[in-house]
Amino acid sequence: METVESSSSAELLRAQMHFSTQLFGFHYTAALKCAVKLGIPDAIKQHGKPMNLSELNSALSINPSKAPCIHRLMRILVTAGYFAQENECFSLTSAGRHFLKDDPLNIRALVLLELHPALVKPWIALGEWFQNDDVSPFATAHGKSFWDYVTSDPELRKLFDESMADDSQLIAKALVTEFRYVFEGLKSLVDVGGGSGTLARAIAKAFPNLKCTVCDLPDAVANEHGDGNLDFVAGDMFERVPSADSILLKHILHDWSDEKCVEILKKCREAIPKNGGKVIIVDKLLKNRGHGHAENEHDEATESPLSCDMEMLVLVNGKERDEKEWAKLFSGAGFNDYKYNITPVLGSTSLIEVNFYN
């Protein structure tokens, strides 16, 4: 077995660089959050052309004594790929445009949510959680569940809702353009846990003959109003799902344990008519893999869903799943005569279409 003593200097250097990249990775996301809060992407866009540091400092609401530090912030953000620098001037990259306020597909809220102190603190409590009886690291850090905390904090609730809506915008664009076949021929669809209805609205608009219903908890739909073929109803997915020939679950099941997911899927199965229908699931998909993997297997397609899996553990003690785990849930929920298709939609997010007969 190779030891530290027998490793070459080059190997030790590679190991140290890998460690440093992992350890200090959050510096990049923290810098990105800072840029979003300061409005740097919008300032550059409004300027209409690349900005030099003097112009950028003048456009931002910062303490004049901190102006000399902006170039250091921009330097790390250029390295991260959100901005480009040429001849001492900065411009937005295609990645950086996702943080513009007026971009319909912006993910500003997600950045602010992920770096919110309430969501960062549970990661620090992860080790403590492994040694206690709390339901989640979030509960260890805050003394209450994630859902109870969000409900009690209006600012965080607003940020969470905006983040979910932004995510739905991205998913909706893909579904109604590249995956229209999933909805063709359907008469009714219930978006379970659909919140403000961002995804359901897009589907209802793209398919005017499809009756769409958003079913969520009373406080989530209290201020929402339907229109045309879109409606909102208050309900609890653990008690009853409104009847329809298709049920949509976007980023719902990864919040829950296998046992709770089976309960939800059973309610979905009960909501679908005797002649059959489909459950449409939009969620992360883990790669099927063995107990080990190659030392150099560090690709984004693998790392992104694994990071999301850890986030589900930390926040709500939920989980992401691989194909075998999804199939186990379907069988556990009583989907006896069924078939399913899994198709990548956006990054590590997949569309799982479960067709079955009751």
Curated annotation (Swiss-Prot):
Pathway: Alkaloid biosynthesis. PROSITE patterns: SAM_OMT_II. Optimum temperature is 40 degrees Celsius with (S)-reticuline as substrate. It is found in: Cytoplasm, Cytosol. Its main location: cytoplasm. It holds the Pfam family Dimerisation. The keyword Acetylation does not apply. S-adenosyl-L-methionine binds at G193, D216, D236, M237, K250. One of its GO terms (biological process) is isoquinoline alkaloid biosynthetic process. It comes from the Eukaryota. GO terms for molecular function: O-methyltransferase activity; protein dimerization activity. Its EC number is 2.1.1.-. InterPro entries: COMT-like, O_MeTrfase_dom, Plant_O-MeTrfase_dimerisation, SAM-dependent_MTases_sf, WH-like_DNA-bd_sf, WH_DNA-bd_sf. CDD domains: AdoMet_MTases. Expressed in roots. Optimum pH is 7 with (S)-reticuline as substrate. O-methyltransferase involved in the biosynthesis of ipecac and benzylisoquinoline monoterpenoid-isoquinoline alkaloids natural products, starting by the condensation of dopamine and secologanin, and including emetine and cephaeline, drugs used both as anti-protozoal (e.g. treatment of ameobiasis) and as emetic agents. Catalyzes 2-O-methylation of 3-O-methylredipecamine and, with less efficiency, the 7-O-methylation of (S)-coclaurine, (R,S)-N-methylcoclaurine, (R,S)-4'-O-methylcoclaurine, (R,S)-6-O-methyllaudanosoline, nororientaline, (S)-norreticuline and (S)-reticuline. This is 3-O-methylredipecamine 2-O-methyltransferase IpeOMT3. It comes from Carapichea ipecacuanha. The gene is OMT3.
